[in-house]
Amino acid sequence: MIVRRFLAWARIAPACARADATSALARAFLFTRMDAEQRYEAEIALTVMLDDPSPRVHRALAEAIAGAIEAPRHLITGLVALGGEAAAIVLERTQLLSRAELVDAAALGSERAQIAIANREALPTPVAAALAEVASLGACLALVRNASALATEAQWLRMLERFGAEPQLREALMRRADLSARVRERLMGIVSGVLKHFVVERAWLSRERAEVLVRDAGQQGALALACDKRLDLGETIACLREGERLTPAFIVHALIMGHFDLVVACLANLTDTPCAKVAAFLGDRRRAPLLALLKRAGIPSWLAPVFPVAIAELKAARKLAAGAAAATPLRVALTRILARLEMEAGEGTRRLIVYLRALEAKAAREEARSIAEAMITLDEMDAACAVPPLAAGQVELDAVAVAA
């Protein structure tokens, strides 16, 4: 009888009152004791409210039943079919929809519905795959930001393929700590391409200069990626090779930095040789087996002499550090290696010395920038800004300071 009166009242009541009453009836249906007849009539009344013309009523019903396991299933699917905010609430919270239903909703629903699905707790992989394939940029962003989503490498790569030019997506992906080496390498390549195009388009740099800078930055990024302990080294090396980043310059840079295990993994991948055998070649005092291995790996003959010299310096540095595994600072290592190479300089090593000198100059500039950044504190910056610069001709030397 109460439900019948509710239905009669709902025909004339304002939308806000109908919404409040619908919410109260839904909560009573879910959480209070009713006999079979009362439950039947209440379910009928709630089903009728799906036909209410007001979205406010639909939203109130969705808020009341979306998270309830005991909710009638036809009410859940009915709210999803209505679309709008009510559908989004249900799609994000309900546990009553199957994976197939969620996939259909992701493929056919609005952007709001897709975003709601992307925000679901522990979103299943098949649903994430559907979103990665067809969802809007906004929904893909929501999926990337959902730390609990069970998305795979293939889904991240597909999103990069579709929306890699969008900075919001790239930034969101960079914030994830669980990305595979392949996704990180692809992301690095896209960012490099975008930056190169930007500086050339603005005429800030020539195309040739931009390509050099991007190549150097890419090498630094690849080295950082390969040294990331969260990633499998073998998988990372394979990804770098696929991305054409496993270059002789990259391997030499890693060697000079003291990343012995990384160099071993690179040469093992390039020559299809077990890591243990490569490590033995690198540790052998005889140069012939090592040079043969380097030739198989595609290392140019003019670069090969740096390997035995760098390995000897690395061993000496490790002995001095009592077996510490920390990488040698680049500039220090280069200085030692250059000193040894220049002692035995011949026609074959001149090109190598020129190459290493250029690398040393870059390392010196990077070191100077880092030291200068560390020396200048915020307080010193504020003090410097507070003192007006002296005009030309007004510079006065402190005689005492000069004499001292």
Question: Across the structure, where does each feature detected by a protein language model lie?
Answer:
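Alpha-helical scaffold segments
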Residues: M1-A404
